[in-house]
A protein has these predicted regions:
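Transmembrane alpha-helices and adjacent helix-loop boundaries
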Residues: 1-217
């Protein structure tokens, strides 16, 4: 069996990798969806709304199964596990991030955009340089919480059947009980490592929230 420290470090590294890559996909998709939701062009709004409602309403586990087994079976393609995780978690995350960003964009006073437009600045430039940066400051706490949720949801990758080098923390904890003959230790260690990731993120979210509240007064 693999050595205990090596396996847990692989699991930790993979969990962080799955979380970060899926968050990047979710953030990019969320920005596009949020702008579509706020668009004056009806079809964009309807398409984005349908996407958001679908992926917020379907369990992430089903999305994993769809991209891990359904799509490869239907189209005869085979994706590496990291790609499946990045796409599946990223698409689910994009739906939640889109709603968070939409709320943040709507919280920026309209006068900011109107002032920029009155100075002759194009709408897209005003959005990129003035509105979106302010919106991001508003939504930093919920975005940090989204990273925490992604960290925990990355554990769903176990349903895809992993090679040892693809293990994340939960898979390590689950298989380690029997493979390493170490009792409950693998589960406890996996839980501890999750806390090492999520507790600092939670504290960071609170700090962002406190700073945002202070600036609001």
């Amino acid at each position: 069996a693999p050595m205990f420290p090596n396996v847990i470090l692989v699991g930790l590294g993979n969990t962080l990798f799955y979380t970060v890559t899926s968050f990047v996909v979710g953030l990019l998709g969320g920005i596009v969806l949020a702008l579509m939701r706020l668009s004056s062009f009806g079809p964009y709004r309807w398409l984005a709304t349908a996407y958001v409602e679908f992926f917020r309403g379907v369990p992430a586990l089903l999305v994993f199964l769809a991209f891990g087994y359904g799509v490869p079976f239907a189209f005869g393609v085979s994706w590496p596990i990291p790609v499946v995780v990045m796409v599946a978690l990223g698409m689910v995350s994009a739906a939640y991030i889109a709603e968070t960003l939409r709320a943040g964009l709507q919280a920026v006073p309209r006068g900011q955009m109107e002032a920029a437009r009155s100075l002759g600045m194009p709408t897209w430039r005003a959005m990129v340089t003035i509105v979106i940066p302010q919106a991001f400051r508003i939504v930093l706490p919920p975005l940090t919480n989204e990273v925490i949720l992604l960290t925990k949801d990355s554990s769903l990758v176990y349903v895809l059947g992993l090679a040892a080098h693809e293990y994340e923390l939960t898979k390590f904890g689950r298989d380690g009980i029997s493979a390493l003959d170490a009792g409950m230790t693998p589960i406890l260690v996996a839980g501890l490592f999750y806390l090492v990731i999520t507790v600092p993120l939670s504290l960071l979210a609170r700090r962002f929230e406190a700073r945002s509240t202070k600036k609001g007064h």
